[in-house]
Amino acid sequence: MTSLPLVRPTLLVLALLPLCACPPPSPPPPPAEVVVRPAGEAGRWFAADIDAGRALELVGFLDRRFREPGNAPYRESLDEVESRLRGAGFGADDRLTLERWTLDEDAPTWEPLAASLEVVSPEVETLQSFSAADDRERTMLLIGSPGTAGSLEVDLVRDGEADPKGRAVLARGMPEAEYGRLAEAGASVALFGADARVEGRVSDDGAIPFGSVAAGDWGPVALRLSRATERRLRDLLATGKPVVLRVAASVRVERGPVEMLHAEVRGGPLPGLVVAAHLDEPGAEDNASGVAVAAALAELFGRGIRDGGAPAPNRSLHFVVGPEIAHAEETASRLRGTVGWAIALDQVGRPRGPQSSPHPTRALVERAPDPSQRWRADIGPGSGWMAGGDADEATWSRAAPSLLADVLVALLGGADRGWESHPFEGGSDHVPFLAAGVPSALVWKFPDPTYHTSLDRIGPSVVSSDELAEVGRGCAAMLASLGWEDGATVARAAAAPWETRAGVVAALTPGAAAACAWGRWLEQAADELETMLGAACTASPATAAALAEILGAATRLGDECLRSTIGSGRGGRRGGGA
C-alpha cells in the first residue's frame, strides 16, 4: 500500500484541532454471553442475498489478471478486494477489522507478459501466442518458465528420439515431472501437451492447459500446447522433413512479499466461522468466483453492522483470501482454538449440467473424511476430479465428525436444486483446517470442461451471477443463523437428511459394520453440533427439537448395530432401521 502525501494544514484546520482531538466513541464490545434470537431475526439487519452483480464484476476484474502469489496482478487483485471490504466498513473500528498477513517477506514472483510459438520450416505458421495479460492463450507459458532474450530458432525433436541439447523437445508426460530431466539434458525449449491420464478430459482441441515448472534462469522455455497444436507438430514431424520453430517468451521475475487478507466481524464467545477462498490461479471460475462470493458475504455483513445497526454476532466471522492452501494454513494456525467450522469456496459459479453431456457439471459439497468413504448410503458419488476408493475407519476417524456438509447441502438448496455432498477427496483450502482439527467442507462445481485451461474465462457458460447468488444465499443463511440467531435454521438443515439416511444405512450389506460406523460417527457429530450451537441448544425449543431428531437417528443406528452384531447376521437386521 502507498502512503498518503503529507499536506500542510491550514490555519482553519489548526484552529479546529482541539475540537477534533477526542477519539470517536468506541463501538460496543462483543457480547460476553450468547444472545439467543429466533430464526429470521437477522433479516432485520441483513439482506438474504449477496449483491451477485457486484460479485460478477469482481470476477471480471480478477479474470483479466494472471494471479500468481506476490506478482503485480496478484497484488492488484488483493488491493481490489481490500478496497471493496473497506467500502463496506471493514477497518473502520474494532467491530469490523481488516488486516494483511504476510506469508513470505521475500518470495520469488513470476508474471507472464507475452509468448509466441511459430513454425519457420517447412513453412511459416503461427501456432499459439499471446501479447497481453488477458489474452486467451496466456496459459501457454508454464508458470515458472524463464523467458528468452529475443526469439529462438530451434529444431524440433520428439522426446527420446534425438539429442535434446539446444533443441525444442516435444516432451512426454507432465511438465512438473519431466521438466527437470529436459533441463539437465540441455533442451532449449520444452513443449508439453495435455495429459488426460492426469488432467482429465479437455473439452476443446484449442484449450491450453496451465501448469507449472520449478525453473531457474538456466532452464529451457516451457510451453503448454493445445491438442490441436500438439497434433500439428506431430504431423509435421511425421513427414520426415526437418521442423524448425521460432519461440519467444517474456516474463517478469521479481522478489517481494506474498500477502493475504483477513477480515473479521468480531463477535462473542462461541466458536468462530471461517469463509476461505484462494486468490491465485488465473481462472474466472477457478477461483475468481470463490473470492467474489467470499468478498460479497463479507460486504453483506459489514454493511449490516455499519449501516443497518446490527449488533455484534455471538461468534466471530472470518473471511480470508490468499494463495491456495498457504492462506488456509496461516488462518488455521493463527486462529487455532477459536474456530468451529470452516468453508472453502473454490469454483462456485459454473452453471450445472447440461444433462445431455456425458459428464455434466454437478453442484457439490465435499465432506470431511467420514464413513461415506466406504458406505455412501444416500450420499453422492465422487466428483471425478480424483479417483476415490474405499477407506477404513482408521482413515476417517482422524477427522472430527461434523454435520457441516449436510447443513450446507440443505441451505444451498438441497436435492431440489441439484446440490449433493460427496466423499472426501482433498486438494483445496478445506484440507489445512481439517489437519488442524477444524471441521470444514468444500463448496464447488465439477466436472468442469474448462478446468485449468485457457477456456476458464468469464462468460455466462463459465460463471453465472445466478450461481454466485445461490452459493452466497446458502452461506449467508448459515452465517446469520449461527451468528445472530438461535441456530435453528442450521440444526434443522443438519437433521434433514437423517430421517431417511439412517434407514438407508441400516439396509446396507453388511449392515452391522455400516450401522455401527455411521452410528458412532453421527453421535459424535451431534455432540460437535451441540458445541457449535452453545446456549441455543437449551434456550431454543426449535433448535433442541432438531438436535433431538439427529440423536434419535444415531440411536436407531446404534440399535441396528447392536441387533446385527448379536443376532444371526442377515436374519437379525431390519432394513428400516427402526
Residue ranges, per PLM feature:
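Noncatalytic luminal/extracellular "stalk/propeptide" segments of secretory-pathway proteins
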Residues: A32, V36, E41, A48, ...
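Extracellular/luminal Protease-associated
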Residues: G60, A72, S129-R224, D286, ...
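Short helix-loop-beta-strand segments that form the rim/entrance of peptidase-like active sites
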Residues: L300-E330, T338
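Soluble metallo-hydrolase cores and metallopeptidase-like ectodomains found primarily
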Residues: D135-R158, F210-D286, A296-G308
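Bacterial signal peptide processing site
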Residues: P23-P25
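Acidic, Ser/Thr-rich low-complexity intrinsically disordered segments
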Residues: A488-G567
